[in-house]
């Protein structure tokens, strides 16, 4: 098997002593505005952050502080993609480590593409960012070609598009299958959750 394309070369991130050390949402959004000129990419990260937070609160019974971890991981997972595609993930990880950010947040970001970064999702937060990353973008692409956008969107339509290789061809169906196979929820349920929770994100 070939090495991951953007292999990070390690599986441990941050310092355990920094557990629960989190940036504010305001600081995270400021970082996005500075690092990510592309408005569509910023929207993608905001959508993943919102869906991550909603899942933590509604499905995992997380408290607000834990939900913030989930949201921050989603919000920042692609922060270095636009300016540093050849070092994607490495730059944002090293930056967050320099700020002494909670290692759970950093590991979650590092594990959002195991095939690319060589870091396996370890816990439910890691697994859900892997699930939500590709599916969130795919569902938003589907919304953009609909006159009513998210209104009236249903799971059946998304499932049909997933079986159409020419639609949003850059989205890896193999990654989606792998990601969903790591959790105990069916794909259809995840799709409905994303539709319900990211449609209001601007």
Residue spans of the language-model regions?
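A generic alpha-helix surface/boundary motif
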Residues: 26, 46-50, 89-91, 119-122, ...
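Acidic/His-rich, divalent-metal-binding segments that scaffold phosphate/diphosphate chemistry
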Residues: 2-84
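Conserved active-site and cofactor/substrate-binding residues in soluble primary-metabolism enzymes
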Residues: 23, 43-47, 87, 123, ...
């Amino acid at each position: 098997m070939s090495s991951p394309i953007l292999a990070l070369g390690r599986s441990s991130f941050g310092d355990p002593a920094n557990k629960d050390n989190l940036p504010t949402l305001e600081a995270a959004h400021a970082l996005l505005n500075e690092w990510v000129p592309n408005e569509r990419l910023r929207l993608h990260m905001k959508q993943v952050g919102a869906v991550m937070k909603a899942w933590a609160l509604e499905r995992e019974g997380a408290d607000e502080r834990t939900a913030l971890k989930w949201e921050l991981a989603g919000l920042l997972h692609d922060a270095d993609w636009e300016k540093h595609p050849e070092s994607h993930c490495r730059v944002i990880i090293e930056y967050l480590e320099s700020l002494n950010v909670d290692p759970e947040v950093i590991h979650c970001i590092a594990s959002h593409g195991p095939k690319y970064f060589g870091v396996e999702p370890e816990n439910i937060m890691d697994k859900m960012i892997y699930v939500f990353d590709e599916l969130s973008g795919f569902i938003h692409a589907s919304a953009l070609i609909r006159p009513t956008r998210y209104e009236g969107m249903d799971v059946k339509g998304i499932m049909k598009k997933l079986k159409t290789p020419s639609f949003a061809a850059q989205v890896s169906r193999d990654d989606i299958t792998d990601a969903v196979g790591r959790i105990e929820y069916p794909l259809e349920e995840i799709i409905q959750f994303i539709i319900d929770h990211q449609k209001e994100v601007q």
